[in-house]
Amino acid sequence: MIKKAIARVVEREDLSQSEMIQVMDQIMSGEATPAQIAAFITALRMKGETVAEIAGAARVMRDRATRIRVGKNVLDLDRDDINIDLETILDVVGTGGDGTNTFNISTTVSFVVAACGVKVAKHGNRSVSSACGSADVVEALGISLEVTPETVENCINEAGIGFLYAPALHGAMKFAIGPRKEIGIRTIFNILGPLTNPAGAPCQVLGVYREELVEKLAHVLKNLGCRRGFVVYGMDGMDEITLTTETRMAEVTPEEVKAWLFKPEDLGFARCTMDDLRGGDAVANAVTVRGILEGEKGPKRDVVLINAAFGLVAAGRAANPAEGVKLAVEALDSGAALAKLEKLKALTNA
């Protein structure tokens, strides 16, 4: 199948979702050769990936991931019988690769949202293009990545937050590692990670590194059964909701995708400069994250609040972003968000 798919994609023909599933099955089972994988993902990048192609690939990755159980059930985005009140779980994640070198905003947001009573399955990896990926800062904060899936499950169930280290839970990705490194360009795999949370998080805030991906990935999330989510791109290049300028956003519900341009002033926040949000290496960013959780004020705290607000809306904890900001402020000022960090640290090192 993959040889035929390469020939078609080279001619700029789109694949159906079922055809993409067949190709990805070959890639992730080890049937496709490294040369075939490299040729296919390069041709796909040159043609441009469609919603159906991305969704098909994401379904295969999800099916082959080590599943993380929350409560009594494995959450599955394909299920029609999800009780959203009992099983709401959120992921706040970016594609990475935006090149802005900010501190780890979505990781900080995860602790804040968890402190507001939302179960968080934070899916992440080491750095792609910055000095510090989410896994790097989590490790620098003293949270162990060398844990079993059962420990991750226990963290989410007991602490309300767990870190899902992508390489440990997506074993079938090993067949694509070599070709990806050797060709050295962005491919479909750069956007699949945030779409393939092993806990099946039905609520999501997803940051992307290109504006044209906002509505495309919003439609992918809808295709995959997302209950509610936001896809965001800061017009300064950030794969987060930014405070330096406007943010292109798309809200996802089972019924529709709605896009708009969000301004920080809409929620009463002052704009800042990119330098105000810059990060450093893992150790420096860990100091920043802990400082915010301990109550330090400033633009870094503000950008966490604004991103947490939309996470709380996505999870149904807040009726609107303004209410979300109030809840996030309380989570930080009360020490509840810091307590989530300490609890997760303790559970992963027990």
Swiss-Prot record:
Its EC number is 2.4.2.18. One of its GO terms (biological process) is L-tryptophan biosynthetic process. Homodimer. Gene3D superfamilies: Nucleoside phosphorylase/phosphoribosyltransferase catalytic domain (3.40.1030.10), Transferase, Pyrimidine Nucleoside Phosphorylase, Chain C (1.20.970.10). It comes from Geotalea daltonii (strain DSM 22248 / JCM 15807 / FRC-32) (Geobacter daltonii). One of its GO terms (cellular component) is cytosol. This is Anthranilate phosphoribosyltransferase. The keyword Signal does not apply. Binds 2 magnesium ions per monomer. InterPro entries: Anthranilate_Pribosyl_Tfrase, Glycosyl_Trfase_fam3, Glycosyl_Trfase_fam3_N_dom, Glycosyl_Trfase_fam3_N_dom_sf, Nuc_phospho_transferase.
